[in-house]
């Protein structure tokens, strides 16, 4: 079985969002409130060259993987900050969603929904979820780079 580990992203080491996403890992998929996208995705296991089906939930820049809709907790997830989302043609039969990481130290993920329309739905949702967090990331960076006397309340 495939397991994914969420590690605290270096850019948000003590942010409440990290605690929320870590908590969400322990929840069943339908207990996550207001997901941005949900449904079945196949993920390419490049070690075995096979596609594994997962029930997935996208919420606040994090993609959670479950073995099924009836799972009691997530297998794991991916923090999507910094990832780019593109559609690639694998062969004549299948278009895939490529999640490319911000640097070589992280791995790329290859996903596929049931059909082209589902792929487009996921791509749109993934891009929106990632972009929603870019202003927050920039605001945190700007705040952290200010002189100490300006950041006191």
Please annotate each region the language model reported:
Residues 15, 20-23, 59, 73, ...:
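Short amphipathic alpha-helical segments embedded in low-complexity Lys/Glu-rich regions
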Residues 64, 86, 145-153:
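Short amphipathic alpha-helical patches
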Residues 1, 5-33, 37-38, 42-47, ...:
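Polybasic, Ser/Thr-rich intrinsically disordered tails and inter-domain linkers
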Residues 1-4, 20, 56, 62, ...:
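Intrinsically disordered, Pro/Ser/Thr-rich cytosolic linker and juxtamembrane tail regions that serve as
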Residues 32-78, 122:
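Polybasic phosphoinositide-binding surfaces of eukaryotic membrane-targeting domains
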Residues 63, 79-89:
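Phosphoinositide-dependent membrane-docking surfaces
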Residues 48-53, 85-142:
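Canonical pleckstrin homology
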């Amino acid at each position: 079985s495939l397991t994914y580990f969420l590690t605290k992203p270096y850019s948000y080491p003590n942010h409440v969002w990290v605690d929320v996403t870590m908590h969400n890992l322990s929840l069943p998929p339908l207990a996550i409130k207001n997901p941005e996208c949900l449904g079945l995705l196949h993920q390419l296991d490049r070690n075995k060259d096979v596609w594994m089906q997962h029930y997935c939930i996208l919420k606040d820049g994090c993609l959670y993987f479950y073995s099924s809709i009836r799972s009691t907790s997530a297998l794991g997830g991916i923090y999507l900050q910094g990832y780019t989302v593109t559609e690639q043609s694998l062969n004549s039969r299948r278009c895939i969603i490529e999640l490319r990481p911000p640097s070589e130290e992280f791995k790329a993920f290859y996903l596929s929904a049931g059909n082209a329309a589902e792929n487009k739905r996921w791509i749109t949702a993934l891009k929106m979820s990632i972009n929603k967090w870019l202003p927050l990331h920039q605001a945190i960076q700007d705040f952290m780079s200010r002189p100490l006397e300006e950041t006191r309340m």
